[in-house]
């Protein structure tokens, strides 16, 4: 079935036709953008409907996010959010938490509500609102339940003793310059990579990671994006990411394009070649 969408204006970003007033679609595929009169050849002898829902609106191309990191989003989105900003997500809304006391209260609620047999991952902490974080502070609320508090920037995290024991952090292995403060349970920048390598069995667990990618698809579509890019594919584990991304970010149910580039710090040609052969992802 053909559908003719009328609009007050269509911004095409095409120099040969900067503006239009109609879009013709068949089964979700755009056939033509232009004026209603120019679409007569498509409509002649065909069943079609005219959709006026955009008649007084402006249609513009989808947004492009060249710095999204799908794997990072897939890791973060299943976590519990405690953030200073309100998040309106397709599956619910997260209210802002803007004080140290409120952060601790929310963490205590999560500790009480969530499965005690599972580690607790919290994302969204920022010291400007939530005060100084430390292993001791986490343990004063979560005790010896493995708990990870991930900074809003993603560039640092904090773990309590139980979490460090769970992932195999060995205090004697921590050397000066590793950007790790073992007494505070603080892993940042270079030290974050050390932590991630040990957290991967949990944050990249197949079921959790797949669920995170499904949430990513919802978020990208919800935000009106039609193209996303990642210049650091493989920041967690290249093989696991490449396989999961190729399965999740292609197909008829994915309403956006994805451009993946292997993380520059990956060594050798093998990783780049594998990136170039991700089927269906350009």
Model-identified regions with their sequence ranges:
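Divalent metal-binding segments
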Residues: 2-6, 11, 15-26, 30-277
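Non-catalytic terminal/interface segments that mediate subunit docking, oligomerization
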Residues: 278-282
